[in-house]
Amino acid sequence: MDYILKAENLTKIYGHHKALDNFSIHIPQGSIYGLVGKNGAGKTTLLRIICGLQEATSGDYSLYGISSRKHEILNARKEMGAVIETPAIYLDMSATGNLKEQYRVLGLRSFDTILKMVGLEDEAMVTGTVAFKVSLLAQSLSPGLLTIMLLYSII
């Protein structure tokens, strides 16, 4: 069976707190799963590890059959996208700067090509009747526009 995600004994420790404790899961391709649990159960930590935003203290996982320990995991992460809890943005960086940083983290090379694909090669981005400058500081964006910016980052 092909798995989109296989996690084996993932553990994440912050100081004296275990956010994940030998967590394992196998998610077959084509299936739909939901992560449900109490606050502090490790749901966000698991997603942050899979997205490459944090490293597990121990254990391993694979995406599309590619181990997290291999450099090719960057290519596997390009096939997924996530907006986790509070969006991870740099408030002192422009919207464009935030998008470029996300592409750098994912190992994507041609940010300008992506901007052209989504019609953002100019300084302005238009969504419905709302126009805003891409160069606005991210902290000045409304929650809706911030969500749009984050969704563009996972295209």
Model-found features: residue ranges?
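Q-loop/switch helix immediately C-terminal to the Walker
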Residues: T86, D92-G107
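Short coil-to-beta microelement around the adenine-binding A-loop and adjacent beta1/P-loop entry
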Residues: H17-K18, L74
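Conserved ABC transporter NBD signature motif
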Residues: G59-R69, N75-A76
